[in-house]
């Protein structure tokens, strides 16, 4: 937070802060908390019903309860109250004060989750209890459980961060609305993000992708290579639109319901440690502090770039000293050692790009693009951002035999992307006319419908109204008019040779994109 506020003070020095129209943050807070195992402890209580053993879900320790709801929302097995009380007593004895309760198909009927919460809150007064259907109404029980657990594990720390940001801006008399960048490249008001902090994971790579969209010609198909100190993030822009991961963000080996770009992180960057063992040179994955040319203790790719004249960062003599140490163990010159370091970095990143292309080809959005375009995906460019991009990306592009683009302001593409990203939200509506009910997937809002033979047009109208209401709750109602229906389908339910109802599904979204009016100065 101190670094962020220091940068903010530099930015607003000599500026009339009353003219600031919006503040957008791209933060790695949640990412770092999860990576460093600094999240709050959570007791995970599952009501899985019949099917796959929940111990196979890779969700960590959990408590399993009896009871089941089917896919239509009908209770098919009852809860065991004594079992619930026993589970609550175990949680109390453990000292954990946060409980995530997640039942299979709870988004169709939350009665079991609510009953468990009611009983446990009496035995665990003061504990924070999060229910799965309120975090996500999407199908896929393991992902909803993972998302609920991570939401509760990060919510309090994120709230402290948001409060500190709000106070810091208030102290600086900055009254502009504050937004946070999400993993899908859209922004969300800071206050609205308090209920869904895990949405901000991977906002760093998302900001870089939005920055590339802003800094390169529209409609291009490009591989984005964001080279940082410790890692390099790879992403794909298809005809001007970033590719989203169909399975949601993967967090700490768990798939979640967080919408996110399809990004791969490679454990290599400008600060990666260079080592030699048995005449074999390795770069990364570990990082041992700053580059030697910047006062660090060991050689890095940044030192190699400095020796070869591809960068002006750091002290040249210290960089030469670092590469000389590598050269002595490889029996070559310092310049040759530097070339070998860069060749290793370029080869690792290029091979990861090729491997990720094979992964991208499995994404539904890519396959649809391939059908629509009637052509095989071939990147037109490799677009580099980050401090080391001007030096490394031309080499990576050459290895991949494509054009290289390092846009102006590439070093701050992340900040530009955050600044120009517009708000975005998604709403998935499921309607069961026989049961007379609807539910929204994003926040589990439920309601009644009276029309047994509801048409798709009526369903889309209801979805639009609910999206406008959700946008209002999140403080971005002015963008709701831009919402598009991206899919809608209906299934008739037949019983006894007669249609007894319909299942309708509608998806609407304010798509990710750039603000309509912006410029770099």
Mark where each language-model region is.
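N-terminally biased helix-coil "hinge/interface" segments that flank
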Residues: 1-521
């Amino acid at each position: 937070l101190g670094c962020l506020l220091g940068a903010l003070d530099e930015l607003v020095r000599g500026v009339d802060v009353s003219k600031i129209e919006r503040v957008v943050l791209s933060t790695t807070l949640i990412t770092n908390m999860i990576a460093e195992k600094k999240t709050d402890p959570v007791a995970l209580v599952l009501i899985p019903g019949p099917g796959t053993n929940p111990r196979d879900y890779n969700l960590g320790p959990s408590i399993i309860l009896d009871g089941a709801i089917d896919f239509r929302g009908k209770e098919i097995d009852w809860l065991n109250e004594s079992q619930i009380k026993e589970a609550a007593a175990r949680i109390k004895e453990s000292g954990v004060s946060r409980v995530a309760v997640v039942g299979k198909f709870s988004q169709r009927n939350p009665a079991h989750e609510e009953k468990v919460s009611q009983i446990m809150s009496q035995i665990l007064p003061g504990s924070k209890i999060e229910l799965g259907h309120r975090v996500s109404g999407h199908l896929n029980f393991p992902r909803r459980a993972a998302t609920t657990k991570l939401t509760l594990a990060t919510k309090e720390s994120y709230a402290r961060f948001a409060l500190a940001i709000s106070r810091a801006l208030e102290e600086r008399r900055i009254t502009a609305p504050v937004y946070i960048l999400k993993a899908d490249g859209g922004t969300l008001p800071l206050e609205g993000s308090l209920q869904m902090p895990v949405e901000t994971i991977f906002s760093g790579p998302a900001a870089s992708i939005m920055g590339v969209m802003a800094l390169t010609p529209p409609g291009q198909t490009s591989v984005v290579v964001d080279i940082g100190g410790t890692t390099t993030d790879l992403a794909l822009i298809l005809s001007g639109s970033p590719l989203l991961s169909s399975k949601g963000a993967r967090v700490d080996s768990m798939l979640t319901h967080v919408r996110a770009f399809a990004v791969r992180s490679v454990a290599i960057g400008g600060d990666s440690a260079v080592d030699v063992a048995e005449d074999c040179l390795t770069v990364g994955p570990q990082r041992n502090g700053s580059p030697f040319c910047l006062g660090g203790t060991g050689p890095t790719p940044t030192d190699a770039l400095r020796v070869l004249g591809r960068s002006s960062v750091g002290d040249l003599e210290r960089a030469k000293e670092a590469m000389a140490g590598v050269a002595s163990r490889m029996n070559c010159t310092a310049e040759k050692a530097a070339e070998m370091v860069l060749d290793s970095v370029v080869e690792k990143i290029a091979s990861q790009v090729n491997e990720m292309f094979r992964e991208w080809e499995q994404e539904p959005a890519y396959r649809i693009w391939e059908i629509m375009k009637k052509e095989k995906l071939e990147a037109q460019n490799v677009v580099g951002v980050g401090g080391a991009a001007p030096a490394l990306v031309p080499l990576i592009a050459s290895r991949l035999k494509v054009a290289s683009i390092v846009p102006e302001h590439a070093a701050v593409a992340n900040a530009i992307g955050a600044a120009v990203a517009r708000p975005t939200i998604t709403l998935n509506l499921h309607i069961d006319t026989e049961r007379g009910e609807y539910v929204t997937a994003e926040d589990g809002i439920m309601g009644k419908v009276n029309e047994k033979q509801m048409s798709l047009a009526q369903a889309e109208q209801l979805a639009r109204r609910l999206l406008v209401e959700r946008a209002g709750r999140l403080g971005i109602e002015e963008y709701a008019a831009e919402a598009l229906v991206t899919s809608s389908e209906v299934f008739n339910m037949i019983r006894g040779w007669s249609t007894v109802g319909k299942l309708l599904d509608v998806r609407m979204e304010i798509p990710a994109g750039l603000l309509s009016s912006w410029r770099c100065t």
